[in-house]
Design a protein with these regions (language model features):
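Conserved functional hotspots at enzyme active or ligand-binding sites that engage polyanionic ligands
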Residues: 1-61, 65-150
């Protein structure tokens, strides 16, 4: 058994370190909601969002569209779960949330939070329906907070 531990140490030293993730340039954001049936920056729409595990699972959830990258939507996920109660745990996991209040995207008008640290790149076909538009001041505050990510 001691040899197995020694072998693991040797192998771990020989492994090449993973290359660092390339930082993407900050996305270009605009505020351009239009009641035209298309997902536009500034709108909260419902879309299928893959889980972070990348195993093919996900769920239909509200997202705030913050821009476009070619024919893909740039969006941030919303939730009605209050992360203020577990803020330390969320921060330790690298997740950052911001309160955005209630809106027409939630039929129960529950207060929502937007996740700032995970920019989603979604196919326009992933959008199921429009929910509502965030007002300009809240949109600008979300974008500023998103850009201040470390």
């Amino acid at each position: 058994m001691p040899e197995r531990g020694r072998l693991r140490r040797i192998v771990s030293r020989l492994r090449a370190p993973r290359p660092p993730k390339r930082a993407r340039a900050a996305p270009r954001t605009t505020y351009a909601p239009q009641a035209d049936g298309q997902a536009d920056p500034g709108e909260v729409v419902w879309a299928w969002v893959p889980y972070e595990e990348g195993d093919g699972r996900g769920k239909d959830r509200p997202v705030l569209v913050v821009g476009r990258e070619g024919d893909r939507l740039l969006a941030l996920a919303l939730t009605s779960k209050d992360h203020d109660r577990d803020a330390a745990q969320e921060a330790a996991a690298g997740r950052r949330w911001m309160d955005v209040g209630a809106g027409g995207w939630d039929r129960e008008r529950r207060p929502s939070e937007v996740r700032l640290d995970r920019l989603l790149r979604l196919d326009s076909a992933a959008v199921r329906r429009e929910g509502a538009a965030l007002d300009r001041s809240r949109f600008d505050a979300v974008v500023a907070a998103m850009r201040s990510q470390p």
